[in-house]
Amino acid sequence: MKLVVGLGNPGRKYDQTRHNIGFMVADALVRRYVGSPPTTKFEGEISECRIENEKVLVLCPQTYMNASGQSVRKAMDFYKLSPEDILVICDDLNLETGRVRLRRSGSAGGQKGLVDIIRHLGSEQWARLKIGIGRPPAKWQVSDYVLGKFDKTELEEMEHAIVHSCDATACWVADGVTEAMNRYNAASGT
């Protein structure tokens, strides 16, 4: 069993915002693999699907980005999962818009949702799939930028990034993090 966590903020006002790209990928993954309708559990919405005969739980914490760790910890404890069974999908300001990068482990890189997950799990040893949203224009506050909606051009780039992220996630489930990194990090570029 694997746990895929899409990070974002709950509520319609955050739909299609840069910070919610993790939710967008999670939703696309559940649609692609005909997952179960989401149920409310672990302070999040969780669906179940099968990828390459592996049971995959797809969790979207409803605690807001900065408190995502408590939801992830509850799901991990309930299903008795190890950090190697988890993939967290989130936005990254330090990657160009639409670029996808999978990592085996590492620091939060300033991403507040990842910071909270590291705090709750007591470890950085879990995979993360980061999707570039680029840097804010001059004079923009970072918070306004990440909570802002994608413009039309960005949304087109994100549609490709979402497909690429779903492919990379399926490879991670079926073939492991090393194979997924080798196959999808090189192919990502915009």
Curated annotation (Swiss-Prot):
Q: Which domain of life is it from?
A: Bacteria
Biological process terms in GO annotation: protein quality control for misfolded or incompletely synthesized proteins; rescue of stalled ribosome
UniProt subunit comment: Monomer.
**Record keywords, A-Z:** Cytoplasm, Hydrolase, RNA-binding, tRNA-binding
What does the protein in this record do?
Hydrolyzes ribosome-free peptidyl-tRNAs (with 1 or more amino acids incorporated), which drop off the ribosome during protein synthesis, or as a result of ribosome stalling. Catalyzes the release of premature peptidyl moieties from peptidyl-tRNA molecules trapped in stalled 50S ribosomal subunits, and thus maintains levels of free tRNAs and 50S ribosomes.
Catalytic reactions on record: an N-acyl-L-alpha-aminoacyl-tRNA + H2O = an N-acyl-L-amino acid + a tRNA + H(+)
Name of the protein this chain belongs to: Peptidyl-tRNA hydrolase
Q: Which organism is it from?
A: Rhodopirellula baltica (strain DSM 10527 / NCIMB 13988 / SH1)
Location in or out of the cell: Cytoplasm
Whichever gene encodes this chain, its name is pth
**What family does the Swiss-Prot or TrEMBL record give for this protein?**
Belongs to the PTH family.
Q: Please state the Enzyme Commission number of this protein.
A: 3.1.1.29
Residues with site note (Stabilizes the basic form of H active site to accept a proton): 91
